[in-house]
Protein backbone atom coordinates (compact mmCIF):
# COMPACT_ATOMS: atom_id res chain seq x y z
CA UNK A 1 0.00 0.00 0.00
CA UNK A 2 1.36 3.42 -0.98
CA UNK A 3 1.95 6.16 1.58
CA UNK A 4 -0.78 8.45 0.18
CA UNK A 5 -3.35 5.66 0.27
CA UNK A 6 -2.46 4.89 3.88
CA UNK A 7 -2.85 8.56 4.76
CA UNK A 8 -6.23 8.83 2.99
CA UNK A 9 -7.50 5.72 4.73
CA UNK A 10 -6.40 7.11 8.07
CA UNK A 11 -8.19 10.39 7.35
CA UNK A 12 -11.38 8.53 6.39
CA UNK A 13 -11.18 6.41 9.52
CA UNK A 14 -10.70 9.52 11.63
CA UNK A 15 -13.67 11.17 9.91
CA UNK A 16 -15.85 8.12 10.50
CA UNK A 17 -14.74 8.05 14.11
CA UNK A 18 -15.54 11.73 14.62
CA UNK A 19 -18.89 11.27 12.86
CA UNK A 20 -19.81 8.36 15.11
CA UNK A 21 -19.06 10.50 18.16
CA UNK A 22 -20.98 13.53 16.91
CA UNK A 23 -24.44 14.10 18.40
CA UNK A 24 -27.31 16.21 17.07
CA UNK A 25 -29.60 18.18 19.38
CA UNK A 26 -33.10 18.23 17.88
CA UNK A 27 -35.64 21.03 18.34
CA UNK A 28 -37.47 19.22 21.12
CA UNK A 29 -34.21 18.74 23.04
CA UNK A 30 -33.78 15.09 22.16
CA UNK A 31 -30.26 13.92 21.25
CA UNK A 32 -29.57 11.52 18.40
CA UNK A 33 -26.48 10.33 16.47
CA UNK A 34 -25.20 12.44 13.58
CA UNK A 35 -26.20 10.90 10.22
CA UNK A 36 -24.77 12.30 7.01
CA UNK A 37 -27.32 10.29 5.02
CA UNK A 38 -30.10 12.59 6.22
CA UNK A 39 -28.26 15.64 4.91
CA UNK A 40 -27.54 13.88 1.62
CA UNK A 41 -31.24 13.02 1.23
CA UNK A 42 -32.36 16.59 1.97
CA UNK A 43 -29.96 18.10 -0.58
CA UNK A 44 -30.97 15.60 -3.27
CA UNK A 45 -34.66 16.41 -2.64
CA UNK A 46 -33.94 20.14 -2.97
CA UNK A 47 -32.33 19.60 -6.39
CA UNK A 48 -35.20 17.40 -7.53
CA UNK A 49 -37.68 20.06 -6.37
CA UNK A 50 -35.98 22.72 -8.49
CA UNK A 51 -34.70 20.79 -11.52
CA UNK A 52 -36.85 17.62 -11.37
CA UNK A 53 -33.68 15.58 -12.00
CA UNK A 54 -30.61 15.36 -9.78
CA UNK A 55 -28.51 13.08 -12.06
CA UNK A 56 -26.71 15.89 -13.89
CA UNK A 57 -25.86 17.57 -10.59
CA UNK A 58 -24.42 14.54 -8.77
CA UNK A 59 -20.87 15.91 -8.80
CA UNK A 60 -21.98 19.29 -7.42
CA UNK A 61 -24.15 17.60 -4.82
CA UNK A 62 -21.21 15.42 -3.79
CA UNK A 63 -19.02 18.50 -3.32
CA UNK A 64 -21.68 20.19 -1.20
CA UNK A 65 -22.14 17.11 0.99
CA UNK A 66 -18.37 16.74 1.48
CA UNK A 67 -17.98 20.38 2.49
CA UNK A 68 -21.00 20.29 4.83
CA UNK A 69 -19.69 17.13 6.48
CA UNK A 70 -16.21 18.63 6.86
CA UNK A 71 -17.51 21.77 8.57
CA UNK A 72 -19.70 19.80 10.95
CA UNK A 73 -16.96 17.37 11.94
CA UNK A 74 -14.47 20.19 12.49
CA UNK A 75 -16.66 21.53 15.27
CA UNK A 76 -14.89 20.91 18.54
CA UNK A 77 -18.13 20.46 20.49
CA UNK A 78 -19.49 16.92 20.51
CA UNK A 79 -23.07 18.21 20.20
CA UNK A 80 -24.43 20.39 17.42
CA UNK A 81 -27.91 21.91 17.09
CA UNK A 82 -30.08 20.92 14.14
CA UNK A 83 -30.57 24.62 13.32
CA UNK A 84 -26.79 25.10 13.01
CA UNK A 85 -26.58 22.11 10.65
CA UNK A 86 -29.30 23.64 8.48
CA UNK A 87 -27.46 26.98 8.43
CA UNK A 88 -24.31 25.22 7.20
CA UNK A 89 -26.24 23.33 4.52
CA UNK A 90 -27.90 26.49 3.19
CA UNK A 91 -24.57 28.36 3.13
CA UNK A 92 -22.82 25.59 1.18
CA UNK A 93 -25.70 25.07 -1.25
CA UNK A 94 -25.82 28.82 -1.93
CA UNK A 95 -22.13 28.79 -2.85
CA UNK A 96 -22.88 26.30 -5.63
CA UNK A 97 -26.49 27.10 -6.67
CA UNK A 98 -28.44 30.07 -5.29
CA UNK A 99 -31.74 28.86 -6.78
CA UNK A 100 -31.55 25.57 -4.89
CA UNK A 101 -30.29 27.44 -1.84
CA UNK A 102 -33.41 29.62 -1.87
CA UNK A 103 -35.65 26.57 -2.32
CA UNK A 104 -33.92 24.91 0.63
CA UNK A 105 -34.36 28.04 2.74
CA UNK A 106 -38.03 28.42 1.77
CA UNK A 107 -38.68 24.79 2.65
CA UNK A 108 -36.99 25.26 6.01
CA UNK A 109 -39.08 28.36 6.77
CA UNK A 110 -42.27 26.55 5.78
CA UNK A 111 -41.41 23.63 8.07
CA UNK A 112 -40.65 26.10 10.85
CA UNK A 113 -44.04 27.76 10.33
CA UNK A 114 -45.78 24.39 10.54
CA UNK A 115 -43.89 23.50 13.72
CA UNK A 116 -44.67 26.88 15.25
CA UNK A 117 -48.36 26.57 14.36
CA UNK A 118 -48.50 23.15 16.01
CA UNK A 119 -46.81 24.50 19.12
CA UNK A 120 -49.15 27.50 19.14
CA UNK A 121 -52.17 25.23 18.69
CA UNK A 122 -51.12 23.09 21.65
CA UNK A 123 -50.59 26.21 23.75
CA UNK A 124 -53.95 27.73 22.74
CA UNK A 125 -55.83 24.50 23.49
CA UNK A 126 -54.02 24.06 26.80
CA UNK A 127 -54.99 27.65 27.67
CA UNK A 128 -58.65 26.92 26.92
CA UNK A 129 -58.61 23.93 29.26
CA UNK A 130 -56.73 25.60 32.13
CA UNK A 131 -58.51 28.94 31.77
CA UNK A 132 -55.47 31.04 30.83
CA UNK A 133 -56.39 31.63 27.16
CA UNK A 134 -58.65 34.58 27.93
CA UNK A 135 -58.74 35.75 24.32
CA UNK A 136 -60.40 32.53 23.14
CA UNK A 137 -62.57 32.12 26.25
CA UNK A 138 -63.94 35.68 26.13
CA UNK A 139 -64.01 36.26 22.37
CA UNK A 140 -67.76 35.62 22.05
CA UNK A 141 -70.07 36.93 24.77
CA UNK A 142 -72.69 34.39 23.70
CA UNK A 143 -70.35 31.49 24.53
CA UNK A 144 -69.65 30.51 28.13
CA UNK A 145 -65.99 29.59 27.82
CA UNK A 146 -65.81 27.82 31.17
CA UNK A 147 -68.31 25.13 30.10
CA UNK A 148 -66.95 21.86 28.75
CA UNK A 149 -69.39 21.84 25.81
CA UNK A 150 -68.19 25.29 24.76
CA UNK A 151 -64.54 24.37 25.27
CA UNK A 152 -64.89 21.53 22.77
CA UNK A 153 -66.09 24.04 20.18
CA UNK A 154 -63.31 26.49 21.04
CA UNK A 155 -60.68 23.75 20.76
CA UNK A 156 -62.02 22.75 17.34
CA UNK A 157 -61.94 26.42 16.38
CA UNK A 158 -58.24 26.72 17.20
CA UNK A 159 -57.49 23.71 14.99
CA UNK A 160 -59.58 25.25 12.20
CA UNK A 161 -57.56 28.48 12.39
CA UNK A 162 -54.29 26.57 12.00
CA UNK A 163 -55.61 24.53 9.08
CA UNK A 164 -57.14 27.61 7.44
CA UNK A 165 -53.73 29.27 7.36
CA UNK A 166 -52.43 26.37 5.29
CA UNK A 167 -55.41 26.49 2.91
CA UNK A 168 -55.68 30.25 2.31
CA UNK A 169 -53.13 31.91 -0.04
CA UNK A 170 -50.20 33.61 1.66
CA UNK A 171 -50.92 37.14 0.41
CA UNK A 172 -54.49 37.03 1.74
CA UNK A 173 -53.36 35.78 5.16
CA UNK A 174 -50.62 38.43 5.31
CA UNK A 175 -53.20 41.17 4.67
CA UNK A 176 -55.35 39.68 7.43
CA UNK A 177 -52.44 39.43 9.88
CA UNK A 178 -51.34 43.02 9.40
CA UNK A 179 -54.91 44.29 9.84
CA UNK A 180 -55.64 45.52 6.31
CA UNK A 181 -58.54 43.09 5.97
CA UNK A 182 -60.41 40.84 8.37
CA UNK A 183 -61.27 37.28 7.39
CA UNK A 184 -64.17 36.53 9.70
CA UNK A 185 -64.83 33.15 11.33
CA UNK A 186 -61.53 31.41 10.59
CA UNK A 187 -62.46 29.10 13.46
CA UNK A 188 -65.13 27.56 11.20
CA UNK A 189 -63.43 27.89 7.82
CA UNK A 190 -62.48 24.22 7.41
CA UNK A 191 -66.06 23.05 7.92
CA UNK A 192 -68.37 22.71 4.92
CA UNK A 193 -70.93 25.12 6.34
CA UNK A 194 -71.92 28.69 5.65
CA UNK A 195 -72.52 31.86 7.61
CA UNK A 196 -75.98 33.36 8.20
CA UNK A 197 -79.43 33.25 6.63
CA UNK A 198 -83.11 34.13 6.50
CA UNK A 199 -84.93 30.90 7.38
CA UNK A 200 -87.81 29.94 5.10
CA UNK A 201 -90.03 29.26 8.09
CA UNK A 202 -93.17 29.53 5.98
CA UNK A 203 -92.19 26.49 3.89
CA UNK A 204 -91.15 24.48 6.95
CA UNK A 205 -94.35 25.17 8.90
CA UNK A 206 -96.81 24.97 6.03
CA UNK A 207 -95.29 21.91 4.31
CA UNK A 208 -93.67 20.18 7.26
CA UNK A 209 -90.04 19.45 8.04
CA UNK A 210 -87.80 16.82 9.63
CA UNK A 211 -85.82 17.23 12.85
CA UNK A 212 -83.52 14.43 14.05
CA UNK A 213 -85.15 12.07 11.54
CA UNK A 214 -88.62 12.79 13.00
CA UNK A 215 -91.39 14.05 10.73
CA UNK A 216 -92.82 17.39 11.86
CA UNK A 217 -96.16 18.07 10.20
CA UNK A 218 -98.00 21.36 9.82
CA UNK A 219 -98.89 22.68 13.31
CA UNK A 220 -102.53 22.92 14.30
CA UNK A 221 -102.10 25.83 16.71
CA UNK A 222 -99.94 28.89 17.38
CA UNK A 223 -98.50 27.32 20.52
CA UNK A 224 -97.18 24.33 18.57
CA UNK A 225 -95.93 26.49 15.69
CA UNK A 226 -93.93 28.70 18.07
CA UNK A 227 -92.36 25.68 19.75
CA UNK A 228 -91.42 24.13 16.41
CA UNK A 229 -89.90 27.46 15.32
CA UNK A 230 -87.51 27.39 18.28
CA UNK A 231 -86.54 23.77 17.55
CA UNK A 232 -85.85 24.71 13.94
CA UNK A 233 -83.75 27.65 15.10
CA UNK A 234 -81.61 25.41 17.33
CA UNK A 235 -81.08 22.90 14.51
CA UNK A 236 -80.14 25.64 12.04
CA UNK A 237 -77.72 27.20 14.54
CA UNK A 238 -75.96 23.83 14.88
CA UNK A 239 -75.56 23.59 11.09
CA UNK A 240 -74.00 27.00 10.42
CA UNK A 241 -71.83 29.50 12.28
CA UNK A 242 -73.64 32.81 11.74
CA UNK A 243 -76.89 34.41 12.77
CA UNK A 244 -80.38 33.66 11.51
CA UNK A 245 -83.68 35.49 11.19
CA UNK A 246 -87.30 34.40 11.11
CA UNK A 247 -90.32 36.62 10.53
CA UNK A 248 -93.55 36.90 12.50
CA UNK A 249 -95.31 37.00 9.14
CA UNK A 250 -94.66 33.25 8.81
CA UNK A 251 -96.12 32.61 12.28
CA UNK A 252 -99.12 34.91 11.87
CA UNK A 253 -101.30 32.34 9.99
CA UNK A 254 -101.23 30.16 13.10
CA UNK A 255 -102.75 32.97 15.16
CA UNK A 256 -105.71 32.71 12.82
CA UNK A 257 -105.70 28.90 13.02
CA UNK A 258 -105.78 29.09 16.82
CA UNK A 259 -108.59 31.63 16.71
CA UNK A 260 -110.65 29.38 14.44
CA UNK A 261 -110.00 26.47 16.78
CA UNK A 262 -111.19 28.53 19.76
CA UNK A 263 -114.25 29.69 17.80
CA UNK A 264 -115.20 26.07 17.11
CA UNK A 265 -114.84 25.33 20.80
CA UNK A 266 -117.31 28.07 21.79
CA UNK A 267 -119.68 27.52 18.85
CA UNK A 268 -121.44 24.69 20.66
CA UNK A 269 -122.34 26.89 23.64
CA UNK A 270 -125.53 29.05 23.54
CA UNK A 271 -123.79 32.27 24.61
CA UNK A 272 -124.53 35.87 23.71
CA UNK A 273 -122.43 36.86 20.65
CA UNK A 274 -120.74 39.82 22.35
CA UNK A 275 -119.83 37.68 25.36
CA UNK A 276 -118.68 34.85 23.09
CA UNK A 277 -116.46 37.22 21.08
CA UNK A 278 -114.97 38.54 24.32
CA UNK A 279 -114.24 35.01 25.54
CA UNK A 280 -112.67 34.10 22.19
CA UNK A 281 -110.49 37.24 22.22
CA UNK A 282 -109.38 36.61 25.81
CA UNK A 283 -108.48 32.98 25.16
CA UNK A 284 -106.60 33.90 21.99
CA UNK A 285 -104.64 36.60 23.84
CA UNK A 286 -103.76 34.06 26.53
CA UNK A 287 -102.53 31.61 23.91
CA UNK A 288 -100.46 34.34 22.25
CA UNK A 289 -98.99 35.29 25.63
CA UNK A 290 -98.16 31.67 26.51
CA UNK A 291 -96.76 31.00 23.03
CA UNK A 292 -94.46 34.03 23.07
CA UNK A 293 -93.31 33.18 26.58
CA UNK A 294 -92.53 29.60 25.52
CA UNK A 295 -90.69 30.94 22.48
CA UNK A 296 -88.59 33.32 24.58
CA UNK A 297 -87.65 30.71 27.17
CA UNK A 298 -86.89 28.08 24.55
CA UNK A 299 -84.57 30.38 22.61
CA UNK A 300 -82.72 31.47 25.75
CA UNK A 301 -82.40 28.02 27.32
CA UNK A 302 -81.66 25.84 24.29
CA UNK A 303 -77.98 25.12 23.67
CA UNK A 304 -76.62 24.37 20.22
CA UNK A 305 -73.74 22.08 19.28
CA UNK A 306 -71.26 24.95 19.59
CA UNK A 307 -72.22 25.64 23.20
CA UNK A 308 -74.37 28.75 22.81
CA UNK A 309 -77.93 29.93 22.34
CA UNK A 310 -79.11 30.34 18.73
CA UNK A 311 -78.19 33.81 17.45
CA UNK A 312 -81.74 34.55 16.39
CA UNK A 313 -83.49 37.70 15.21
CA UNK A 314 -87.24 38.09 14.76
CA UNK A 315 -88.56 40.32 11.99
CA UNK A 316 -91.61 42.43 12.87
CA UNK A 317 -92.82 43.86 9.55
CA UNK A 318 -96.54 44.59 9.73
CA UNK A 319 -97.08 44.94 5.99
CA UNK A 320 -94.81 42.13 4.81
CA UNK A 321 -97.98 40.20 3.95
CA UNK A 322 -100.98 42.57 4.24
CA UNK A 323 -103.34 39.61 4.71
CA UNK A 324 -101.85 38.98 8.16
CA UNK A 325 -101.05 42.52 9.35
CA UNK A 326 -103.48 42.26 12.27
CA UNK A 327 -102.05 38.94 13.48
CA UNK A 328 -98.46 40.20 13.20
CA UNK A 329 -99.46 43.23 15.29
CA UNK A 330 -100.90 40.97 18.01
CA UNK A 331 -97.70 38.94 18.17
CA UNK A 332 -95.52 42.07 18.09
CA UNK A 333 -97.40 43.63 21.01
CA UNK A 334 -96.80 40.55 23.15
CA UNK A 335 -93.11 40.35 22.19
CA UNK A 336 -92.63 43.99 23.21
CA UNK A 337 -94.53 43.56 26.49
CA UNK A 338 -92.52 40.52 27.50
CA UNK A 339 -89.25 42.15 26.49
CA UNK A 340 -90.15 45.15 28.64
CA UNK A 341 -91.02 42.89 31.55
CA UNK A 342 -87.66 41.11 31.36
CA UNK A 343 -86.63 37.55 32.09
CA UNK A 344 -85.50 36.34 35.50
CA UNK A 345 -81.84 35.46 35.78
CA UNK A 346 -80.41 32.77 38.09
CA UNK A 347 -80.72 35.17 41.03
CA UNK A 348 -84.43 35.72 40.38
CA UNK A 349 -83.86 39.29 39.18
CA UNK A 350 -85.60 40.36 35.98
CA UNK A 351 -82.98 41.24 33.40
CA UNK A 352 -82.80 41.88 29.66
CA UNK A 353 -82.94 38.64 27.71
CA UNK A 354 -80.22 38.13 25.12
CA UNK A 355 -82.25 36.64 22.28
CA UNK A 356 -84.10 36.96 20.05
CA UNK A 357 -83.09 40.33 18.67
CA UNK A 358 -86.17 42.18 17.48
CA UNK A 359 -86.18 43.96 14.10
CA UNK A 360 -89.07 46.43 13.95
CA UNK A 361 -90.00 47.91 10.56
CA UNK A 362 -91.29 51.48 10.43
CA UNK A 363 -93.93 52.02 7.74
CA UNK A 364 -96.80 54.36 6.89
CA UNK A 365 -99.25 52.65 9.27
CA UNK A 366 -97.07 52.70 12.41
CA UNK A 367 -94.74 55.72 12.15
CA UNK A 368 -96.98 58.74 12.58
CA UNK A 369 -99.15 59.91 15.44
CA UNK A 370 -102.68 58.74 14.68
CA UNK A 371 -101.62 55.92 12.33
CA UNK A 372 -103.34 52.59 12.97
CA UNK A 373 -100.44 50.82 14.67
CA UNK A 374 -98.63 53.80 16.18
CA UNK A 375 -99.40 52.33 19.61
CA UNK A 376 -96.97 49.52 18.74
CA UNK A 377 -94.21 52.00 17.92
CA UNK A 378 -94.73 53.80 21.24
CA UNK A 379 -94.46 50.43 22.98
CA UNK A 380 -91.32 49.64 20.97
CA UNK A 381 -89.74 52.96 22.02
CA UNK A 382 -90.43 52.18 25.70
CA UNK A 383 -88.84 48.81 25.12
CA UNK A 384 -85.77 50.41 23.53
CA UNK A 385 -85.38 52.85 26.40
CA UNK A 386 -85.24 50.02 28.93
CA UNK A 387 -83.92 47.01 26.99
CA UNK A 388 -81.96 48.52 24.03
CA UNK A 389 -84.20 46.56 21.67
CA UNK A 390 -85.76 46.46 19.06
CA UNK A 391 -83.59 47.64 16.19
CA UNK A 392 -85.49 49.89 13.78
CA UNK A 393 -85.61 49.49 10.01
CA UNK A 394 -87.20 52.01 7.65
CA UNK A 395 -89.39 50.50 4.94
CA UNK A 396 -89.35 53.81 3.06
CA UNK A 397 -85.55 54.12 3.04
CA UNK A 398 -84.94 50.47 2.17
CA UNK A 399 -87.27 50.74 -0.79
CA UNK A 400 -85.55 53.96 -1.91
CA UNK A 401 -82.07 52.41 -1.74
CA UNK A 402 -82.65 48.72 -2.52
CA UNK A 403 -86.16 48.60 -3.90
CA UNK A 404 -87.49 46.21 -1.26
CA UNK A 405 -87.80 45.95 2.52
CA UNK A 406 -86.56 42.78 4.22
CA UNK A 407 -84.71 41.87 7.44
CA UNK A 408 -81.03 41.46 8.16
CA UNK A 409 -79.65 37.97 8.74
CA UNK A 410 -79.03 37.65 12.47
CA UNK A 411 -77.73 41.08 13.37
CA UNK A 412 -76.29 43.09 10.48
CA UNK A 413 -75.61 41.14 7.27
CA UNK A 414 -78.03 42.00 4.50
CA UNK A 415 -78.81 40.29 1.21
CA UNK A 416 -78.91 41.79 -2.26
CA UNK A 417 -82.14 41.27 -4.23
CA UNK A 418 -82.51 37.99 -6.11
CA UNK A 419 -85.37 37.12 -8.42
CA UNK A 420 -87.15 33.91 -9.33
CA UNK A 421 -89.82 34.19 -12.03
CA UNK A 422 -89.59 37.96 -11.73
CA UNK A 423 -90.33 37.99 -7.99
CA UNK A 424 -87.78 38.94 -5.31
CA UNK A 425 -86.78 36.08 -2.99
CA UNK A 426 -85.17 36.67 0.41
CA UNK A 427 -86.19 33.81 2.71
CA UNK A 428 -84.30 30.60 2.13
CA UNK A 429 -81.12 32.53 1.31
CA UNK A 430 -77.87 33.24 3.14
CA UNK A 431 -74.23 34.17 2.67
CA UNK A 432 -71.04 32.10 2.49
CA UNK A 433 -68.86 34.17 4.80
CA UNK A 434 -67.62 37.66 5.49
CA UNK A 435 -64.50 39.69 4.74
CA UNK A 436 -63.99 43.26 5.94
CA UNK A 437 -61.70 46.01 4.62
CA UNK A 438 -60.07 48.20 7.28
CA UNK A 439 -60.56 51.69 5.79
CA UNK A 440 -58.37 53.53 8.37
CA UNK A 441 -55.56 51.09 7.52
CA UNK A 442 -56.06 51.82 3.81
CA UNK A 443 -55.91 55.57 4.52
CA UNK A 444 -52.67 55.23 6.49
CA UNK A 445 -51.05 53.04 3.85
CA UNK A 446 -51.99 55.50 1.09
CA UNK A 447 -50.41 58.37 3.10
CA UNK A 448 -53.49 60.57 2.72
CA UNK A 449 -53.20 60.70 -1.07
CA UNK A 450 -56.67 60.30 -2.64
CA UNK A 451 -55.43 58.57 -5.80
CA UNK A 452 -53.27 56.18 -3.82
CA UNK A 453 -56.15 55.57 -1.41
CA UNK A 454 -58.36 54.11 -4.13
CA UNK A 455 -55.50 52.08 -5.58
CA UNK A 456 -54.78 50.58 -2.15
CA UNK A 457 -58.50 50.08 -1.56
CA UNK A 458 -58.83 48.21 -4.87
CA UNK A 459 -55.92 45.99 -3.88
CA UNK A 460 -57.53 44.92 -0.61
CA UNK A 461 -61.01 44.67 -2.10
CA UNK A 462 -59.56 42.28 -4.65
CA UNK A 463 -58.15 40.15 -1.82
CA UNK A 464 -61.58 40.11 -0.18
CA UNK A 465 -63.18 39.08 -3.46
CA UNK A 466 -60.67 36.25 -3.86
CA UNK A 467 -61.40 35.13 -0.31
CA UNK A 468 -65.11 35.04 -1.13
CA UNK A 469 -64.36 32.96 -4.22
CA UNK A 470 -62.33 30.55 -2.07
CA UNK A 471 -65.31 30.07 0.25
CA UNK A 472 -67.49 29.39 -2.79
CA UNK A 473 -65.04 26.93 -4.36
CA UNK A 474 -64.72 25.12 -1.04
CA UNK A 475 -68.41 24.20 -1.09
CA UNK A 476 -68.23 22.56 -4.51
CA UNK A 477 -68.95 18.85 -4.22
CA UNK A 478 -70.53 19.20 -0.76
CA UNK A 479 -73.75 17.20 -0.51
CA UNK A 480 -77.07 18.28 1.01
CA UNK A 481 -76.73 15.59 3.69
CA UNK A 482 -74.00 17.68 5.37
CA UNK A 483 -76.78 19.83 6.94
CA UNK A 484 -80.22 18.26 6.35
CA UNK A 485 -82.21 20.96 8.16
CA UNK A 486 -80.80 23.56 5.76
CA UNK A 487 -80.58 21.80 2.45
CA UNK A 488 -83.11 18.94 2.61
CA UNK A 489 -85.89 20.02 4.95
CA UNK A 490 -86.73 23.57 4.01
CA UNK A 491 -84.67 26.13 5.92
CA UNK A 492 -82.85 26.91 2.68
CA UNK A 493 -83.94 24.28 0.18
CA UNK A 494 -85.53 20.87 -0.47
CA UNK A 495 -82.67 18.96 -2.10
CA UNK A 496 -82.08 15.21 -2.08
CA UNK A 497 -79.32 13.93 0.25
CA UNK A 498 -76.79 13.39 -2.57
CA UNK A 499 -77.51 16.63 -4.41
CA UNK A 500 -74.70 19.20 -4.55
CA UNK A 501 -75.50 22.28 -2.49
CA UNK A 502 -73.47 24.42 -4.89
CA UNK A 503 -76.23 24.00 -7.48
CA UNK A 504 -78.63 25.73 -5.08
CA UNK A 505 -76.07 28.42 -4.24
CA UNK A 506 -75.53 29.13 -7.94
Regions of interest found by a model, annotated:
Residues 114, 121-505:
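Conserved catalytic cores of very large enzyme subunits
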Residues 2-131:
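Charged, amphipathic alpha-helical regulatory modules used
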Amino acid sequence: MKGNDIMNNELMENARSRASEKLVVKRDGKICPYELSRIRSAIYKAYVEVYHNEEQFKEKIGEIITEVNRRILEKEEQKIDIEEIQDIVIEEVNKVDKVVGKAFKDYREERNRIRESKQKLYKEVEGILDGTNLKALNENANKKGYMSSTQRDLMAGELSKVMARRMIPKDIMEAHDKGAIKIHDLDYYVNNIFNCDLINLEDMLQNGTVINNKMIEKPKSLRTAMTIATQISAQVASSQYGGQTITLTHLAPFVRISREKIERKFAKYPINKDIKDKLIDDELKLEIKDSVQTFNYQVNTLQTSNGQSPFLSVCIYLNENPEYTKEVAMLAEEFFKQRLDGMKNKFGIKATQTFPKLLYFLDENNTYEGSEYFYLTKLAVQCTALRMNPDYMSVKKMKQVIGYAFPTMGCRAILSPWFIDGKPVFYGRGNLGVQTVNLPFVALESKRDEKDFFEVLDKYLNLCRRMGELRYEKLKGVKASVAPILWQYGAISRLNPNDDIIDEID
